Swiss-Prot record:
Protein name per Swiss-Prot or TrEMBL: Protein kintoun
Residue ranges with Acidic residues bias: 389-403
UniProt similarity note: Belongs to the PIH1 family. Kintoun subfamily.
Residues found modified as Phosphoserine: S378, S770
Gene designation: Nop17l
Record GO biological process: axonemal dynein complex assembly; cilium-dependent cell motility
Location of the protein in the cell: Cytoplasm
GO terms of molecular function: protein phosphatase 1 binding
Keyword field: Cytoplasm, Phosphoprotein
Length: 846
């Protein structure tokens, strides 16, 4: 797109539109001088003297002599009239080219040559020429125009009158010279040859060359060198030779006129509001204004104009004014409502075409779509009180609102798996996860801020498709799609029972949950196929199956009868639970029963409070007992040592024990993993539920994984019913040890300091003892030091389970000996503790 104003500025120098640099005083002086009769007479005499041919000849001789003194030979070229070519510059300014002659220009010559394309013989011409500077002039209507002179030898003009091809070559040479020298574009499609020999007044030009043999005086610099024209360089002594043209320049049949497209827009105050749809049509103009420059036409009666919704076509076949223009419009226009106007003074055609905008219904639909895209994802529909501006009709009257019809809208076309996803929309596969529960499957699609209205589902007997969209911070929608298909099985009954009955899809803040419900008699499959669409599916496994809880599952199976023994001591109550077949007691059991009647020491009380766990030997026995009946028959000959688990309860349940001064536990709930036993509301802690329907003891022989064992949830089972927690035990000490290191001291220095502190404390305790107590303390201290040297005595703790197995019979004697050793150590500890308690009591009394 270009404008006429820009092209006029481009040729301002050619038009000589520069204003004269004259002051106001100078202008007044010239005006006063011209008002005098004497000055006017002298001025006219000067003009006549300059235009006199004799005086001009004398002037040329003087100039030639002056230039010769500077070492420059000059020749005055006086162009003689020939013929005139009329055209235009850049399709705007009228231009005349004078084809003149002068004997001062060299003769044209020719050489025999070969045509490189056809191979035919011909003549290759060399045509010398001379050019004058362009000058401004006026045409017959006193309009501004431009005039150029191109001078050839008289023989060249004589040949042009006899040979039409030579004449055409002469004209092309003159046009090329003007375009190359003045950097303009001439209209070669509309050349005219007026009946003129010469346009304007002939003005001579000068050919300047350096002298061939200058004298020493001529080579000396002239005192007025700065006032004369610059000497021509020595390289220009020879005429400039242009490359020979082997192919004629193509001459277009029609010229393309200059044009411009302007977008016209009215000022609408509704576009300056804060509505979301206020500036929807800011970039859409009300109309398009197309301006076409036609300087060679007097009216539009000689041209054809066709306007369509997207283009403009102009054609002029008049001789000397051939124009053709095919223009594509940037907007759809109403060709029936346009108008055209031709300016005869400026030779300009203006076409005004209104732009077709969308209808009111389409604009309202676009407004609703924009509101939907810009809605905040807060879970609550936002309704704005302000409505979008309503477009008025052409007559300006508001249309009457017709009565609403009760006709139901047409049903949308049925979706199929092939047409469910649009080809023009790019879909992404979201991250997903699957959970199964009986005959239901739940898919969690990890996509946040999903628009609930954008969720569309498609269900078949064996597959489900879902698509939805989410809006980002830039109001740009992102589309997602998910396709799930059940695995194919050849059985007809399987297909009949395992079919998808219904689906539910719900959008949350951070994801989308889709639920699939299969037949009532079917179960969730172990695998499924998923992907973006039906092509390129991938198989996924369902890792977790969960069964819904029923009343039958909640009912506890009756435990086999067990033998329960309750022994009450001074400080605690010991409950022993044994299976009915473990009635045989061993020597170790008798010793343990005797030990229970004794007063427990401080360490024993702490040990009894610790929670016991399974050992590896007990787990091995569970695996053996979990074998089939053949395993039981095979191990029937092996003597089975009765298995037990003892737990000491404080008297916390009045309904079972009926004692006073109870210490209740702080554990208020069971483990989060595994099944929970049913407890009555009257139990305030786990200790209150000791005699509930779920026993607190663990019987490995009858119930390998009873409901009272709340451990780590099992993941991979090597045997059915056996948890991996049986093979891993963790014991925690009640005493918390803390070691603090100072940053400005070494560890060894702190160790010595702590050892010194302990020695001081020990000496202080010795000073408090009497003579008899000191002796007992020394004996007790020696015994304690010996026990520290034997780590096998104090570091072994009873886990509360009788370790039985294949090697249990071989270690019966060793166990009895180690038990006696531990009993001796326990007696010594009890004695030391009693002595320390007595010392504390004496200190309190003091």
């Amino acid at each position: 797109m270009s404008t006429a104003a820009g092209s006029r500025k481009k040729h301002s120098k050619l038009h000589n539109e520069e204003r004269a640099d004259i002051t106001k005083d100078e202008f007044e002086a010239i005006r006063e001088a011209l008002s005098k009769e004497e000055f006017r007479k002298l001025f006219f005499d000067y003009v006549e003297e300059v235009q006199d041919p004799e005086n001009r000849k004398i002037y040329e001789q003087e100039i030639t002599q002056l230039e010769k003194e500077r070492g420059v030979d000059i020749k005055f070229v006086h162009p003689k009239p020939g013929f005139v070519v009329k055209t235009s510059i850049d399709g705007e300014l009228k231009c005349f080219i004078n084809i003149a002659s002068s004997p001062e220009v060299a003769r044209p010559n020719s050489e025999v040559g070969m045509n490189p394309e056809t191979g035919g013989r011909g003549l290759s011409w060399s045509i010398p020429m001379a050019q004058t500077g362009g000058r401004d002039d006026c045409d017959a209507k006193n309009n501004h125009c431009k005039v150029f002179d191109v001078v050839f030898h008289p023989d060249a003009l004589h040949l042009s009158t006899r040979d039409s091809q030579f004449r055409k070559a002469l004209i092309d040479t003159a046009l090329d010279a003007v375009e190359r020298e003045y950097e303009v574009a001439l209209d070669r499609a509309n050349l005219k040859y007026p009946k003129l020999d010469y346009k304007g007044i002939a003005r001579p030009t000068v050919i300047r060359k350096l002298a061939a043999n200058p004298t020493p005086e001529e080579q000396e610099p002239h005192p007025l060198e700065h006032m004369y024209p610059t000497k021509p360089p020595a390289s220009n002594s020879e005429p400039k030779i242009l490359p020979m043209k082997t192919k004629a320049a193509p001459v277009p049949e029609f010229a393309v006129p200059k044009y411009s497209i302007k977008q016209s827009h009215d000022v609408d105050l509704s576009e300056y509001t804060d509505e979301l749809d206020a500036k929807l049509h800011v970039t859409v103009p009300r109309s398009l204004v197309v301006e076409i420059e036609l300087p060679l036409l007097r009216s539009t009666a000689e041209c054809q104009l066709d306007v369509t919704a997207k283009s403009v076509y102009l054609l002029s076949e008049r001789l000397g004014a051939k124009y053709r223009l095919k223009l594509d419009l940037p907007f759809v226009v109403d060709d029936k409502a346009g108008n055209a106007r031709f300016d005869t003074e400026k030779r300009r055609l203006s076409i005004t075409l209104p732009v077709v905008r969308k209808s009111v219904n389409q604009q309202r639909q676009m407004h609703d779509t924009l509101r939907y895209l810009s809605r905040e994802d807060s879970g609550v529909e936002l309704h704005s009180n302000s409505e979008s501006p309503v477009e008025d009709d052409a007559d300006g009257d508001m249309p009457e609102t017709p009565e609403l019809e009760t006709a139901a809208p047409p049903d949308p076309p049925a979706l199929t798996p092939s047409t469910f996803l649009k080809d023009s929309v790019h879909y992404q596969l979201p991250k997903f996860d699957c959970n199964a529960l009986d005959n239901a499957m739940a898919f969690v699609l990890d996509v946040a801020h999903v628009q609930p209205d954008s969720i569309v589902t498609l269900k078949t007997d064996r597959s489900v498709s879902v698509k939805f969209a989410t809006i980002g911070s830039g109001y740009y929608p992102t589309h997602y799609a998910f396709y799930m298909e059940l695995p194919s099985v050849d059985m007809e009954e399987y297909h009949k029972d395992h079919c998808i009955e219904s689906i539910e899809a719900e959008a949350w803040d951070n994801n989308v949950i889709m639920k699939l419900f299969l037949g009532a008699e079917s179960k969730a499959p172990t695998s499924y196929l998923a992907g973006l669409h039906a092509n390129g599916l991938k198989e996924y496994q369902v890792y977790g199956h969960y069964k819904a809880k029923t009343d039958k599952n909640n009912e506890c199976e009756p435990n086999p009868p067990r033998v329960v023994q309750i022994m009450r001591t001074d400080d605690a109550v010991v409950i022993t639970v044994r299976p009915p077949h473990t009635s045989i007691t061993t020597e170790e059991d008798d010793e343990q029963q005797q030990q229970l009647h004794k007063k427990p020491s401080k360490k024993q009380r702490k040990r009894n409070k610790k929670q016991r766990s399974y050992s590896e030997s007990a787990c091995e026995e569970m695996l053996d007992q979990q074998d089939g009946p053949l395993g039981r028959k095979k191990d029937a000959t092996t003597p089975m040592v009765p298995q037990r688990k003892q737990r000491s309860y404080s008297e916390c349940n009045d309904s079972t024990i009926g004692s006073e001064n109870v210490n209740r536990g702080i554990l208020k709930r069971f483990s989060r993993y595994g099944p929970r036993p049913s407890m009555s509301d009257s139990c305030s802690s786990i200790d209150d539920c000791g005699f509930s329907s779920h026993s607190c003891s663990v019987d490995a022989s009858s119930s390998l994984f009873s409901q009272s064992f709340n451990g780590i949830p099992e993941e991979d089972r090597t045997e059915e019913g056996l948890s991996e927690s049986c093979k891993k035990t963790v014991r925690f000490n009640d005493q918390i040890m803390k070691q603090v290191f100072r940053h400005d001291s070494s560890i060894l220095g702190q160790r010595k300091k702590n050892q010194k502190r302990r020695n001081c404390k020990l000496r202080a305790q010795q000073r408090r003892l009497s003579e008899g107590d000191s002796a007992d303390y020394e004996e007790t201290r020696d015994t304690a030091l010996k026990q520290q040297g034997e780590p096998s005595g104090n570091k072994l703790h009873d886990s509360g389970l009788d370790l039985t197995g294949a090697s249990a019979s071989h270690r019966t004697d060793n166990n009895s000996k180690s038990y006696r050793t531990r009993q001796d150590h326990a007696d010594a500890d009890a004695k030391n503790d009693a002595m320390m308690f007595e010392m504390d009591d004496e200190d309190d009394e003091i």
